[in-house]
């Protein structure tokens, strides 16, 4: 009996382990796993269905088929456990040992493992320093390889073909040893002396200068060192013994009709065994060499197919022409072991059904069909029935439940009380896709869902299904109630705004309820309190929309949380007074004394949550919903054809447009405009016409005439149903109303270009056949796009989750004083996102000082709504806040650097899985983004030629990064490329900001006051000027007529201009001449740039135009030459989802902007073919830096100009890698954040910056080692940032030199595959490559991330699981401490161990 208990115990106990190591298995190890050798290819006997002895399913090797019964049936029952039957040799045991016992095959000839051979880079090739092609020639018996040259002229590792081999035999006899096949490779690997190789390679690394050689050596050195340190032996990459998978993992199942379904692996094993046995027999018979060789090659091929079918040559196919599934295929891909079975498991106690609306439910409830509940809660019901004594056994209880006796329903009611269930809707794009509710039993078969949680689930009731899961243990129930209950998820984790917001009917009802109507029944009445209003409305003495006076008693909450009661008489309407009745105490009447549109309702709930807390907000949200539904019903809004009013002016507007189009057609026919101009003009015209028609329609719809009390006719907002729905934000938009009542407008062709002829009809009038046909393009493209978008968006989310999954908050404060500086986001002069909004919920890194030098906020403050008002009042423009990117915590992030937990509204807790939350927040709106690349056509490209800055608001001028030259007229001319002009208000807050191009003329100075609408700067948008910085006389050089320049005179004005010829037009003599202008003083001496020794001179690029001649005098700030800007063609702008993916994958754009590699003075060196050589000489005397730039790039700087590191020299899209290299981590984070936000903002999606920073942080995990100093890192190697910091700390502690490094930016896919954890990487993508690399280097997985822990079946080290992991660590350390100092352990030691464990 004791035995039996031992067995049960061993099942329950989980082996405690801290890391998983992957490595190569030695032949001895494989034999030690094995329970016997598989000698025959047979599987089972087709008559008796018993496994053949020594075959692939042999019971003697793998264990019995039936529990505790040997094969011949001599020993049965438990009492013979562990006996080995003498007749059939089978051990009596559980049949499930057939899932874990392995066998082996002794190979007659060694075989190379295909993963280490073919998985690039080939590990065998790298370690032997041979090419893959050569190794394959040896392995597949095409050439001999010299293993031991002896006393001959041959080299070790030299390849010989048959002829050369026989020649060598004749010449040297048996002095040397050359072989072919895997055994030759095995012998070479065995002869490798790793320590010697490592030393010689390290020496050569230090002595060589060749880049390629260094690269090659460091690769090989890394591999050999990995082998040496991991204890793997290179010769194990060639197999002598092949393990055989346990038979129950490759089953053979009988089908009806006497046929068998079998796993492909059995076929593959059978092939190997057949060939192996045939080879053994051939070797015994000492068959001719050529036959043996052929057999060996076939054996190699069959083992290759077993391990990874299709990696080499054609895949072996089964009877039905389908490639067989090999061992590698079993673990990789979506259907492989990792993603199908380890990361995604099906769970018990779950059901699914269609969902319907539950408008009468409370927020924390859901309606659960009785049938489902009975099934889901069965075990609870059984135990209750037994406990009550209503049923004697479980079997009896089961019968009762099946009969559905009345007492069963009573017990079900009891069981279900306060037992939450979880509802999930696929696709679960973010954590709000699974929430917990308390079930209410209902009749019927559909689950009832509370309408307010639909937004979080993205659910509607057109047939969506949802799954129900039951948390069984008390811990699970507790977590479901405390963390996952729908009432705890009012705010969205993506942006901290409420997500439980009324929509559709509810919005319409609340909107209708709070509208005003002129001259409604009861207008002008006064009421003493809201109760009286209720009575009057109930008695039909007043209408809902009547304007009345009501005495209101409100309780407001101050910023410090004090309640302030007050009473006053308000001008309001009946509906608003009734609505205020459900508003909780603590909110002022002003929040509802307005027409409640969707945005207002959202703000109301947000305000409610911040002021009166979670519980009140939930109750209030419910009340809002009930009220909204009630009044939506009362309003009787519906849509009829007559509600779409076609504006009477429409016909005239369209006729006018058509006349203008005719006019443009005539101009085109006369050759006055080009095809392109005509197209743009027409499209512009129709866009404007569409706008005009829409405006006319809205004007018509939005207002209606009515008679007021005095009998005058006045206009008021219309009560047209369609208008109310669109205006309130309940459903529909102006764009949709335009199509129904205005005109459909322009349509796009499938390739994205716009068709010139618009659809002038609308849906109410009906479309003609031609118009209908035109509009099918768009509809079809919409459908195709949606399908693509969903897949792409899902894949982006998957990559994001994978890269960020192991980021968890692990400590409260890392003590970092660094941070990133944040300013308001400004686009085209408008503040899009104010500073306060961006820093809300973040921690201040350095004290905030306003413009006057006054102290505003202390470092370490978590900024809340109150602080935001303080910041805005103080007029702070920029502040430094803590960020995940600058956090010093080694594994994980600290709470201070992250800031507020957006879904809860307070500082984030330790254990919050911020990485996954960030990934979900960015990925979830992915489906709302567009897929297309935009073509700029018509309106857009013309609007882009801005030629002046006109300020929108009054204020004070400020300059930023400004370099300017003063003109003799007193105006300033901008002389730098990154200048900005900002306008600040009285408090010193920045209101608008504009970029100024080089050569812009300013009419204001720093500190000037401007008025709204004033033009402060202007420039010529079509040319790029070269401005003289000093005054003097011009001196030309290299300007020879018809060699480098042409003179052109204008007949009209008689002025001549000089044009610099293009390279391709110049004669040979002019190819190397560089046209230049120098400025000299009256005596003819060159004028110097102030403070330097270099003369003022300007290189003239090709196509430059000059209007001044040699010897002319110039003043400072005068334009010397103009370079015409080629209008940049209609380049496609990548937008939407592909743009976000490009940013996160850190792809280098085509023709990226060229940035200055260092700060200094620019000069141009000798040109090479097709490229300009740009040299930057630093002022401090460092080495000059050269950059080669293609000639066709427009270069923005001139000879002798000073640039700052990272300044843009040639325009183009920025490359994130360049930003990181030249401007640092902060600039990069800023760039990616802004670019990603721009895409989402276009779609109206709000995401908090910190989520994007979390992903950027994960992309920056690796560094490249520059000089390795005294650490054991290899130069040019990519290592984890934390690993490098550890190594440097160690070196510094010993007083040695630390390593130098550069941060590296990896795209999210690369970063996921480069994580420390091989389990996480293997379950993401490229499983074979990851596992091969891991095995060779003997990688250890410390199970720090979430994914690895899910795979090994543990709680994740996040959330409530973090406590479990910390406790495990603590116990282990205490046990260790007890072991080491078992005699004396002081309390302080334990304390230390504890605190260390917690820190860890």
Swiss-Prot record:
Signal sequence, renumbered to the chain: none
Entry's EC annotation: 2.7.7.6
Cofactor(s) required for function per UniProt: Mg(2+); Zn(2+)
Keyword GTP-binding: no
SMART domains registered for this protein in UniProt: RPOLA_N
GO BP term, example: DNA-templated transcription
GO-annotated cellular components: DNA-directed RNA polymerase complex
Cofactor note: Binds 1 Mg(2+) ion per subunit. Binds 2 Zn(2+) ions per subunit.
Sites where the protein binds Mg(2+): 460, 462, 464
Keywords linked to the UniProt accession: DNA-directed RNA polymerase, Magnesium, Metal-binding, Nucleotidyltransferase, Transcription, Transferase, Zinc
Binding residues for Zn(2+) 2: 814, 887, 894, 897
Molecular function terms, GO-annotated: DNA binding; DNA-directed RNA polymerase activity; magnesium ion binding; zinc ion binding
UniProt keyword Zinc present: yes
Source organism, top-level taxon: Bacteria
Main enzyme class: transferase
PANTHER family: DNA-DIRECTED RNA POLYMERASE, DNA-DIRECTED RNA POLYMERASE SUBUNIT BETA
Family per record: Belongs to the RNA polymerase beta' chain family.
Quaternary structure and interacting proteins, as annotated: The RNAP catalytic core consists of 2 alpha, 1 beta, 1 beta' and 1 omega subunit. When a sigma factor is associated with the core the holoenzyme is formed, which can initiate transcription.
The protein, known as: DNA-directed RNA polymerase subunit beta'
Organism: Marinomonas sp. (strain MWYL1)
Gene giving rise to this polypeptide: rpoC
């Amino acid at each position: 009996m004791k035995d039996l208990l031992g067995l049960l115990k061993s099942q329950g106990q989980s082996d405690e382990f801290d890391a998983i190591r992957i490595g190569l298995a030695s032949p001895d190890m494989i034999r030690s796993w094995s329970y016997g050798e598989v000698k025959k290819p047979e599987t089972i006997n087709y008559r008796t269905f018993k496994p053949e002895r020594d075959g692939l399913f042999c019971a003697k090797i793998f264990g019995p088929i039936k529990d505790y019964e040997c094969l011949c049936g001599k020993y049965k029952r438990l009492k013979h456990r562990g006996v080995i039957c003498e007749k059939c040799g089978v051990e009596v045991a559980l049949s499930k040992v057939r899932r874990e016992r392995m066998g082996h095959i002794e190979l007659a000839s060694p075989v190379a493992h295909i993963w280490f051979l073919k998985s690039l880079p080939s590990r065998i090739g790298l370690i032997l320093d041979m090419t893959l092609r050569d190794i394959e020639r040896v392995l597949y018996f095409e050439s001999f390889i010299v293993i031991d040259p002896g006393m001959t002229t041959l080299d070790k590792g030299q390849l010989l073909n048959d002829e050369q081999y026989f020649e060598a035999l004749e010449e040297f006899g048996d002095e040397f040893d050359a072989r072919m096949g895997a055994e030759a490779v095995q012998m070479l690997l065995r002869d490798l002396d790793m320590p010697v190789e490592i030393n010689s390679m390290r020496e050569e690394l230090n002595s060589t200068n060749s880049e390629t050689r260094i690269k090659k050596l460091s690769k090989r050195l890394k591999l050999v060192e990995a082998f040496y340190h991991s204890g793997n032996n290179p010769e194990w990459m060639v197999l002598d013994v092949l393990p055989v998978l346990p038979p129950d993992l490759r089953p053979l199942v009988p089908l009806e009709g006497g046929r068998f379904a079998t796993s492909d692996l059995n076929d593959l094993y059978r092939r190997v065994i057949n060939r192996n046995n045939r080879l053994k027999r051939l070797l015994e018979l000492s068959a001719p060499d050529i036959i043996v060789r052929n057999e060996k090659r076939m054996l190699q091929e069959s083992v290759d197919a077993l391990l990874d079918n299709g990696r080499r040559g054609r895949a072996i196919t089964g009877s039905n022409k389908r490639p067989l599934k090999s061992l590698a295929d079993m673990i990789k891909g979506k259907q492989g072991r990792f993603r199908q079975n380890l990361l995604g498991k099906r769970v018990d106690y779950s059901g699914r059904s269609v969902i319907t609306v539950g408008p009468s439910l409370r927020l924390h409830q859901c309606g659960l069909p009785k049938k489902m509940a009975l099934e889901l809660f069965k075990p609870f019901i059984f135990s209750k029935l037994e406990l009550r004594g209503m049923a004697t056994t479980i079997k009896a209880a089961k019968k009762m439940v099946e009969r559905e006796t009345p007492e069963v329903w009573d017990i079900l009611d009891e069981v279900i009380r306060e037992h939450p269930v979880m509802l999930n809707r696929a696709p679960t794009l973010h954590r709000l896709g699974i929430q917990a509710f308390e079930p209410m039993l209902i009749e019927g078969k559909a689950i009832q869902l509370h309408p307010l949680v639909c937004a979080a689930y993205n659910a509607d009731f057109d047939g969506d299904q949802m799954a129900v899961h039951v948390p069984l243990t008390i811990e699970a129930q507790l977590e479901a109630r405390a963390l996952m209950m729908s009432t705890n998820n009012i705010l969205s984790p993506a942006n901290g705004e409420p997500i439980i917001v009324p929509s559709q009917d509810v919005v319409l009802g609340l909107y209708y309820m709070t509208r005003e109507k002129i001259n409604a029944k009861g207008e002008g009445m006064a009421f003493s309190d809201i109760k009286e209003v209720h009575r009057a409305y109930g008695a039909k003495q007043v209408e809902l929309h009547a304007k009345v006076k009501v005495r209101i008693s409100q309780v407001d909450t101050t910023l410090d949380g004090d309640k302030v009661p007050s009473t006053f008489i308000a001008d309001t309407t009946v509906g608003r007074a009734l609505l205020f009745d459900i508003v909780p105490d603590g909110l002022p009447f002003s929040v509802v004394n307005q027409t409640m549109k969707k945005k207002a309702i959202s703000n109301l709930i947000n305000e409610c949550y911040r002021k009166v807390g979670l519980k009140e907000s939930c109750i209030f949200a419910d009340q809002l919903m009930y009220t909204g539904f009630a009044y939506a019903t009362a309003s009787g809004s519906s849509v009829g054809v007559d509600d779409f009013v076609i504006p009477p002016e429409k016909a005239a507007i369209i006729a006018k447009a058509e006349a203008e189009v005719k006019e443009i057609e005539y101009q085109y026919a006369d050759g006055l405009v080009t095809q392109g101009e005509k197209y743009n003009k027409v499209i512009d015209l129709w866009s404007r016409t569409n706008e005009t028609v829409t405006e006319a329609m809205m004007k018509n719809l939005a207002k209606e005439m009515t008679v007021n009390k005095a009998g005058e006719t006045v206009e008021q907002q219309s009560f047209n149903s369609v208008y109310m729905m669109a205006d309130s934000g309940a459903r529909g938009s102006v764009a949709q109303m335009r199509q129904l009542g205005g005109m459909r407008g322009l349509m796009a062709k499938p390739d994205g270009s716009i068709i010139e002829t618009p659809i002038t009809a609308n849906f109410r009038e009906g479309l003609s056949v031609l118009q209908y046909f035109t509009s099918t393009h768009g509809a079809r493209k919409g459908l195709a796009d949606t399908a693509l978008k969903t897949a792409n968006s899902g894949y982006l989310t998957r990559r994001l989750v994978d890269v960020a999954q192991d980021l968890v908050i692990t400590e409260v404060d890392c003590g970092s004083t660094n941070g990133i500086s944040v300013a308001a986001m400004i686009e085209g002069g408008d503040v899009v996102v104010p500073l306060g909004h961006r820093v809300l919920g973040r921690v201040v890194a350095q004290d905030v000082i306003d413009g006057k030098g006054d102290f505003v906020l202390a470092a370490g403050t978590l900024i809340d709504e109150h602080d935001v008002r303080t910041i805005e009042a103080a007029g702070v423009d920029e502040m430094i806040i803590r960020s995940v990117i600058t956090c010093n915590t080694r594994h994980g992030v600290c709470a201070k650097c992250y800031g507020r937990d957006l879904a809860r509204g307070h500082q984030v807790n330790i254990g919050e899985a911020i990485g996954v939350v960030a990934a979900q927040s960015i990925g979830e709106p992915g489906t709302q983004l567009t897929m297309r690349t935009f073509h700029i056509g018509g309106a857009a490209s013309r609007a882009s030629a801005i030629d002046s800055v006109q300020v929108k608001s009054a204020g004070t001028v400020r300059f930023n990064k400004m370099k300017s030259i003063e003109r003799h007229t007193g105006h300033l001319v901008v002389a730098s490329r990154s200048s900005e002009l900002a306008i600040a208000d009285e408090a010193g807050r920045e209101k608008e900001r504009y970029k100024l191009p080089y050569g812009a003329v300013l009419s204001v100075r720093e500190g000037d006051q401007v008025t709204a609408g004033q033009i402060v700067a202007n420039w010529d948008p079509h040319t790029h000027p070269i401005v003289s910085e000093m005054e003097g006389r011009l001196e030309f050089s290299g300007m020879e007529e018809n060699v480098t320049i042409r003179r052109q005179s204008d007949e009209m004005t008689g002025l001549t201009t000089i044009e610099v010829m293009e390279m391709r037009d110049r004669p040979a003599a002019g190819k190397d001449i560089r046209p230049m202008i120098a400025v000299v003083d009256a005596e003819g001496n060159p004028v110097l740039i102030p403070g330097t020794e270099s003369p003022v001179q300007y290189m003239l690029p090709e196509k430059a135009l000059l209007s001044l001649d040699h010897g002319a005098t110039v003043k400072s700030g005068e334009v010397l030459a103009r370079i015409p800007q080629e209008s940049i063609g209609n380049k496609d702008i990548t937008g939407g989802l592909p743009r976000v993916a490009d940013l996160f994958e850190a792809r280098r754009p085509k023709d990226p902007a060229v940035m200055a590699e260092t700060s200094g003075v620019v000069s141009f060196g000798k040109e090479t073919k097709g490229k300009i050589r740009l040299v930057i000489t630093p002022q401090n005397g460092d080495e000059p830096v050269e950059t080669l730039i293609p000639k066709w790039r427009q270069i923005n700087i001139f000879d002798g100009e000073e640039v700052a590191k990272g300044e843009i020299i040639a325009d183009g899209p920025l490359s994130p890698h360049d930003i990181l290299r030249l401007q640092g981590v902060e600039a990069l984070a800023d760039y990616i954040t802004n670019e990603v936000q721009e895409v989402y903002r276009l779609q109206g999606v709000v995401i908090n910056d910190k989520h994007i920073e979390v992903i950027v942080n994960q992309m920056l995990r690796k560094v490249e080692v520059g000089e390795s100093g005294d650490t054991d890192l290899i130069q040019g190697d990519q290592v984890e940032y934390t690993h490098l910091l550890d190594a440097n700390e160690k070196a510094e502690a010993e007083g040695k030199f630390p390593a130098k490094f550069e941060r590296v930016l990896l795209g999210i896919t690369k970063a996921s595959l480069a994580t420390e954890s091989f389990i996480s990487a293997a379950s993401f993508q490229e499983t074979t490559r990851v596992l091969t690399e891991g095995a060779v280097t003997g990688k250890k997985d410390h199970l720090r991330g979430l994914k690895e822990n899910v795979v090994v079946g543990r709680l994740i080290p996040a959330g409530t699981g973090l406590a479990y992991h910390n406790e495990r660590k603590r116990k282990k350390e205490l046990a260790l401490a007890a072991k080491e100092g078992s005699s004396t352990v002081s309390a302080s030691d334990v304390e230390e161990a504890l605190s260390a464990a917690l820190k860890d």
